[in-house]
């Protein structure tokens, strides 16, 4: 990653975020509602969903170069290679078991129309991020760099407040509008990042208060439209602060999280397949009444399988690593 030595904490943060994606998806069991009957399940699920995807887009915006570097063939080719090819590959592969075993999956079909216009079966993040990378360099050149960056940010905020585009599913416009706000915040923050990260010690108490607020209220993010926009920052700041602490000690946790970060796209793309297999097995072994144990087992099996599969199979094969966005290691 460019400027890696300055942003190790962001690598750690992204590693934490992809693990939270795996955990968040572990609450999904076709035909069973394991959230409303268990307070702990609901709390963990909603706390994770309050911020984990905005976090990914915020980091992506932070790491975006200026339009002089982005408005060229090399930039767009890199995004096709990094995002579009894995997106197409995984959705084509995904379509096969969905048609053969449609009773075992949460989403029943993955047609060509859905892949092109509606982000596939479970890959909206990759689809939306790719579209954002396509349009943002143009927005940056013709709007942001014309000293209208505050107006653009205000415009994104108002679009979300009034939920404009929230019902438009084609090209994931609903998610594009929402996630663009966090992408843009990340883009703006990079100019002030060193000053902010350098002042952490001085404001330790404030960060601890934010963590406490996230623990107490993060799961209420979806109560109001304003809380849906503001509350994600509680989780983002809390885990950023934790990442800064982990960064200071290069131990097994550090190494594990950075591995997850550099292969986060593979984790995201392959998690659905692991989920389909283990969901069917576990629901027959563990009674639904023990739903927290069910979630914990589901999460653990998926994470262990993903780590082993990605480390020893995907990363070792140049074709798999290319098609799944992993870091190839001979």
Where are these regions (language model features)?
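Alpha-helical transmembrane segments and their immediate juxtamembrane cytosolic regions
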Residues: 1-330
């Amino acid at each position: 990653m460019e400027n890696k030595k300055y942003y190790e904490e962001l690598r750690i943060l992204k590693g934490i975020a992809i693990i939270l994606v795996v955990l968040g998806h572990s609450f999904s069991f076709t035909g069973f509602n394991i959230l409303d009957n268990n307070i702990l399940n609901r709390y963990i699920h909603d706390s994770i969903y309050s911020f984990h995807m905005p976090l990914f887009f915020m980091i992506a915006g932070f790491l975006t170069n200026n339009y002089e570097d982005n408005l060229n063939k090399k930039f767009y080719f890199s995004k096709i290679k990094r995002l579009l090819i894995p997106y197409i590959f995984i959705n084509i592969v995904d379509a096969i078991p969905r048609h053969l075993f449609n009773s075992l999956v949460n989403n029943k079909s993955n047609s060509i129309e859905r892949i092109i216009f509606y982000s596939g079966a479970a890959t909206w993040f990759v689809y939306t991020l790719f579209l954002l990378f396509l349009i943002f360099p143009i927005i940056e050149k013709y709007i942001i760099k014309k000293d209208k960056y505050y107006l653009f940010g205000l415009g994104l905020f108002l679009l979300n407040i009034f939920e404009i585009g929230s019902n438009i599913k084609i090209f994931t416009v609903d998610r594009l509008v929402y996630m663009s706000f966090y992408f843009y915040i990340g883009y703006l923050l990079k100019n002030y990042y060193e000053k902010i990260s350098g002042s952490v010690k001085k404001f330790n108490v404030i960060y601890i208060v934010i963590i406490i607020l996230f623990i107490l209220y993060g799961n209420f993010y979806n109560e109001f439209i304003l809380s849906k926009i503001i509350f994600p920052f509680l989780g983002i700041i809390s885990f950023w602060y934790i990442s800064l602490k982990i960064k200071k000690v290069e131990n097994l946790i550090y190494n594990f999280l950075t591995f997850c970060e550099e292969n986060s796209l593979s984790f995201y793309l392959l998690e659905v397949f692991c989920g389909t297999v283990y969901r069917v097995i576990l629901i027959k072994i563990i009674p639904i009444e023990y739903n927290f144990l069910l979630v914990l087992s589901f999460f653990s099996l998926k994470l262990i399988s993903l780590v082993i599969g990605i480390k020893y199979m995907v990363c070792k094969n140049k074709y798999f690593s290319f098609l799944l966005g992993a870091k190839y290691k001979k």
